[in-house]
From Swiss-Prot:
An annotated GO BP: translation
Name of protein: Large ribosomal subunit protein uL4
Span list, region Disordered: 56-76
Matches recorded under NCBIfam families: rplD_bact
Subunit structure: Part of the 50S ribosomal subunit.
Gene name for this UniProt entry: rplD
InterPro entries linked: Ribosomal_uL4, Ribosomal_uL4-like, Ribosomal_uL4_dom_sf
Family: Belongs to the universal ribosomal protein uL4 family.
Lineage summary: Bacteria, Bacillati, Bacillota, Clostridia, Eubacteriales
Function: One of the primary rRNA binding proteins, this protein initially binds near the 5'-end of the 23S rRNA. It is important during the early stages of 50S assembly. It makes multiple contacts with different domains of the 23S rRNA in the assembled 50S subunit and ribosome. Forms part of the polypeptide exit tunnel.
Listed GO CC annotations: ribonucleoprotein complex; ribosome
Ranges of Basic residues composition bias in the record: 60-71
One Pfam entry name: Ribosomal_L4
HAMAP family: Ribosomal_uL4_B
Keywords on record: Ribonucleoprotein, Ribosomal protein, RNA-binding, rRNA-binding
Length: 207
């Protein structure tokens, strides 16, 4: 079973934690992770693009000139797709891009992402994370003590307003509860900072 060091808010080690191998120690499935990321990003697309078809463009009901005798190419409408200001053939229409993956696949993707972070030694487990007040400088002190200077995802066992408000003004830092954890944020972060309680809850949810 994989083990990680547990540290306090000052960055000092306070013990070790054995991780559930089924959640944090599997062979990462890159194909499933890719599918999950594509699905998440696709569901975020607005899909509001729209073009006008032949029947939707205003005007163009009258034949612009007679069929023969003018020396010009024949034309039946000034709203032909060939004309400037004309219709669009096979253009985009509003649609939903999102697609759903089976629950087992989504969970496998999350387990793969967490396992890859453990393999890369990019998972930091905090004994506890509690701030007296929602101040950015308080969170900065904690991150500096943990040597976190890049993009990081802070995961707590439940939503904590003081943590969220303390971190939201720090560039590259995101916070989430275990229930809100998603594949894109996990893979897009250089470091994952999880509380000990969050690790336990994650194992309960994904095991």
């Amino acid at each position: 079973m994989p083990k990680v060091q547990v540290v306090n808010m000052q960055g000092s080690p306070v013990g070790e934690l054995e991780l559930d191998e089924y959640v944090f120690g599997i062979e990462p499935n890159t194909h499933v992770m890719h599918q999950a990321v594509v699905g998440q990003l696709a569901s975020q697309r607005r899909g509001t693009h729209s073009t006008l078809l032949r029947g939707e463009v205003r005007g163009g009901g009258r034949k612009p000139w007679r069929q023969k005798g003018t020396g010009r190419a024949r034309a039946g409408s000034i709203r032909s797709p060939l004309w400037r200001g004309g219709a669009v053939l096979f253009g985009p229409k509003p649609r939903k891009y999102g697609f759903s993956l089976p629950k087992k696949v989504r969970r496998l993707a999350l387990r793969s992402a967490l396992s890859s972070k453990v393999n890369e030694q990019k998972l930091i487990v905090l004994e506890d994370l509690s701030l007296n007040e929602a101040k950015t400088r308080e969170m900065v002190k904690v991150l500096q003590a943990l040597n976190v200077s890049k993009k990081a995802l802070i995961v707590t066992d439940e939503f904590m307003e003081t943590i969220e408000r303390s971190a939201r003004n720090i560039a590259g830092i995101k916070t989430t509860a275990v229930e809100g954890m998603n594949i894109y944020d996990l893979l897009n972060s250089d470091v994952i900072v999880m509380t000990k309680a969050a690790v336990t809850k994650t194992e309960e949810v994904l095991a």
